[in-house]
């Protein structure tokens, strides 16, 4: 007593080859057709002639300048990319180039770091008078 085997069948499809192999039409994706399509393809747009291409290239040369392309609207507010010398006077030039005193010598707390502990507590007059007395004693 053998059991009957149940077979699962695929839904009915058109069998072009008559056997178990199904013939499938290869479908090109539209992106490939647009990129690599042939001239005989009716879906392809016609190619632009050379004179139209030259016209398009000449239009590209007359584009907006770079300084106006990136959000700058008025020319009076526009800063030139390369600063000529007439824009900067000598005083402004010196002020721009001179480093600040803090960058040269550090903050006041940094300078006090090298003093002895009792020197920082003394007033300025005492320090000055003390140095004068030391000079007199040496003579």
Swiss-Prot record:
Residues 22-37 have a biased composition (Basic residues). The modification Phenylalanine amide is found at residues 36, 70, 105. Residues 1-48 are annotated as: Disordered. sNPF peptide 1: Expressed in corpora cardiaca (CC), corpora allata (CA), antennal lobe (AL) and gnathal ganglion (GNG) (at protein level). Expression in AL detected in all animals, in GNG in most animals, expression in CC and CA in some animals (at protein level). sNPF peptide 2: Expressed in corpora cardiaca (CC), corpora allata (CA), antennal lobe (AL) and gnathal ganglion (GNG) (at protein level). Expression in AL detected in all animals, in GNG, CC and CA in most animals (at protein level). Plays a role in controlling food intake and regulating body size. GO terms for cellular component: extracellular region. It is found in: Secreted. GO terms for biological process: neuropeptide signaling pathway. Belongs to the NPY family. This is Short neuropeptide F. Its main location: secreted. Residues 1-23, 40-62, 74-96, 109-139 form a propeptide. The lineage of its organism: Eukaryota, Metazoa, Ecdysozoa, Arthropoda, Hexapoda. Keywords: Amidation, Cleavage on pair of basic residues, Neuropeptide, Secreted.
């Amino acid at each position: 007593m053998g059991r009957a085997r149940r077979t699962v069948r695929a839904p009915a499809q058109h069998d072009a080859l008559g056997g178990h192999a199904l013939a499938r039409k290869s479908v090109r994706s539209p992106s490939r057709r647009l990129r690599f399509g042939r001239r005989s393809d009716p879906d392809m747009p016609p190619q632009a002639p050379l004179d139209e291409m030259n016209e398009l290239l000449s239009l590209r040369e007359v584009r907006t300048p770079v300084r106006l392309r990136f959000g700058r609207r008025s020319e009076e507010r526009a800063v030139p990319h390369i600063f000529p010398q007439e824009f900067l006077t000598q005083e402004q030039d010196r002020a721009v180039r001179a480093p600040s005193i803090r960058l040269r010598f550090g903050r006041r707390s940094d300078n006090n770091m090298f003093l002895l502990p009792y020197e920082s507590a003394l007033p300025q007059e005492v320090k000055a008078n003390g140095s004068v007395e030391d000079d007199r004693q040496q003579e």
